[in-house]
Amino acid sequence: MKKLQLLAPAKVNYRLDVLGKRPDGYHELRMIMQRVDLCDEIEIALTDVPGIRVTCGRKGVPDGPGNIAWRAADALLKLSGKEVGIDISIAKKIPVGAGLGGGSSDAATVLMGVNELLGLGLTDERLMEIGVKLGADVPFFIFKKPALAEGIGDRLTALEEVPSLWVVLVNPGIHVSTAWVYQNLRLTTGNPITIIPRSYSSLDEVCALLSNDLEPVTCGRFPLVSEVKEVLLAAGARGSLMSGSGSTVFGLFDDENAARTAAAEIEKTRGWFAAAVRTI
């Protein structure tokens, strides 16, 4: 039985601009995204028993077709025309419904893994075309580089330079529906569209970039998210922002010691999920 063990990393958004609503109902976005080394652990195995089986064991994460990783495997299995089974086991380390892209990363990792196991030889570009039909963030995780993401998140441009940073992720245990956030977003008009640099050489430059148009919506419904930002800044973060549609907030720190100290203190005093991670 052929199998692979893979890691599916989380991501943070240093920038998330909502530029407008498209005729197809999606929103036109502009984002700066980078992966971090908090990872779900995924095992993919080919079996002689036809069908796809996904097991996760995390409350709120479906095991069947409702799981985006299942749909990723199904897309490639149908494309291959092969009569094989695929067993997928996911050990979730990334908080669910938290703005960290865990589900999209799982799907991207399954696409890449099944492509390898079945010997399909699909390029990353082709996998990204398949992935965007599963979720807007899926192509980014196949791209594997810090990126400027435009469109619905599917048009990706690699950043020319970005520093390696220590980041503290804090999740207060609130599940935020991305669909709800976008439904309650009030688009403003007349705001100048600033030019986003493609190169960042320091922590200060990244901190100056931090902005998320979805943050006021989520914080309006869940004031605790604003409190998390304040706690991170009080713990020494040089900058802090909600990632994606929330509820995870991240803080950028000067070094590993500062990040680990802050994460341990926040977890101890507040009881929230807190992890010191590094960008990749």
From Swiss-Prot:
Q: Which residues form the active site?
A: K11, D137
Query: Which cysteines form disulfides?
Result: none
| EC primary class | transferase
The UniProt catalytic activity note for this protein reads: 4-CDP-2-C-methyl-D-erythritol + ATP = 4-CDP-2-C-methyl-D-erythritol 2-phosphate + ADP + H(+)
Per UniProt, what is one GO molecular function of this protein? Answer: ATP binding
Pathway(s) per entry: Isoprenoid biosynthesis; isopentenyl diphosphate biosynthesis via DXP pathway; isopentenyl diphosphate from 1-deoxy-D-xylulose 5-phosphate: step 3/6
Domain of life, per the record? Bacteria
Q: Which InterPro entries does the UniProt record give?
A: GHMP_kinase_C_dom, GHMP_kinase_C_sf, GHMP_kinase_N_dom, IspE, Ribosomal_Su5_D2-typ_SF, Ribsml_uS5_D2-typ_fold_subgr
Q: Name one GO biological process term.
A: isopentenyl diphosphate biosynthetic process, methylerythritol 4-phosphate pathway
**Secretion signal span:** none
Q: Where does ATP bind?
A: P95, V96, G97, A98, G99, L100, G101, G102, G103, S104, S105
Protein keywords: ATP-binding, Isoprene biosynthesis, Kinase, Nucleotide-binding, Transferase
Which Gene3D superfamilies does the record cross-reference, listed alphabetically? Answer: 3.30.230.10, GHMP kinase, C-terminal domain
EC number(s) recorded for this UniProt protein: 2.7.1.148
Q: What does this protein do?
A: Catalyzes the phosphorylation of the position 2 hydroxy group of 4-diphosphocytidyl-2C-methyl-D-erythritol.
**Sequence similarity:** Belongs to the GHMP kinase family. IspE subfamily.
Q: What is this protein called?
A: 4-diphosphocytidyl-2-C-methyl-D-erythritol kinase
